[in-house]
Design a protein with these regions (language model features):
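ATP-dependent helicase/translocase motor core
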Residues: 1-289
């Protein structure tokens, strides 16, 4: 109902093949302008994977938001995109029960099978882990922490967000980079958030959450505008709902109402991050002179 295409992907090999096809379709116009078919040869895709593979979560998040200059077999260079803020251009897919094992990705430690994976342009971007009603939601968080440590390798390093639910409670949180020595710190429960409406009412029901959080404009905006890739340290962050609503309201006040205003919040609520993100988004507006 929210416009995603379902695709059956059983193994990491299937994930790679799908990424190859979707990335070519996503960049079809650019490829055709270079006199190239909307597909990649084995040699071209190998060059892409050399660029994409074996990076940290933090490095992968930066690659996702950047362009890659691919030398085509015909000698032309093309600037490939991996993600766009244009929902009409992105390709949204969903799959379930992907199995990661050493047979298909040698740096996997233990075999795991994932519940639901959301892919954008062929890249796994959001992982959803579901539990039965009555099962503690922290079990799903612990499960994701195990996956991060033992099997989220290769293109699964491009996961940006996680969603956990037992149908009556639903939360989201950001992926986290591994330590310098390769160890993985568990994602803190304090960094796992409920989604709310603009009146701060929690949205716990999984179906309602899905229709709001995963609608194409909302999830695209979340990844594009409301995640922070810090430059001073290898850290990824995602904003809380009230921070997002505050940024939207303040930005609207600046661009449309043209009046003064302020955002108030209590100590420890993330005012600095909210202010930073507002300034960052306003800087991207050509009509704002900062």
């Amino acid at each position: 109902s929210i416009g995603y295409s379902f695709i059956k992907l059983n193994t990491y090999e299937d994930v790679l093949a799908n990424f190859r096809a979707q990335l070519a379709e996503f960049n079809a116009k650019k490829l055709e302008e270079k006199g190239h078919a909307a597909s990649f040869s084995d040699a071209e895709f190998n060059r892409i994977m050399i660029h994409m593979d074996n990076h940290s979560v933090y490095e992968s998040a930066k690659i996702l938001r950047d362009k890659y200059i691919l030398q085509l077999d015909n000698g032309e260079n093309v600037y490939l995109d991996f993600f766009s803020n244009d929902t009409d251009r992105n390709i949204y897919q969903v799959t379930h029960q992907v199995t990661m094992d050493k047979v298909h990705k040698e740096d996997v430690v233990y075999k795991n099978r994932y519940d639901v994976t959301v892919l954008i342009n062929g890249l796994p971007m959001i992982q959803i882990e579901l539990k039965r009603p009555g099962v503690e939601i922290n079990e799903a968080i612990n499960q994701i922490n195990r996956y991060r440590k033992f099997s989220f390798k290769g293109l699964f390093r491009y996961l940006q967000l996680f969603v956990v639910s037992n149908s009556v409670q639903t939360k989201y949180f950001c992926n986290e980079n591994e330590m310098v020595d390769g160890r993985y710190n568990p994602i803190l429960k304090s960094l796992v958030f409920f989604w709310t409406d603009d009146k701060n009412t929690r949205i716990n029901d999984l179906n309602t959450f899905t229709s709001e959080f995963f609608c194409k404009p909302a999830i695209t905006e979340m990844i594009d505008k409301y995640m922070i890739i810090k430059t001073t340290e290898p850290v990824l962050m995602v904003m809380r709902p009230y921070q997002i609503y505050a940024v939207k309201a303040a930005k609207k006040r600046v661009l449309e109402v043209k009046q003064n205003g302020y955002v108030f919040a209590c100590t420890g609520s993330g005012k600095t991050l909210t202010s930073f993100k507002l300034a960052q988004l306003l800087r991207e507006e050509a009509r704002v002179d900062l």
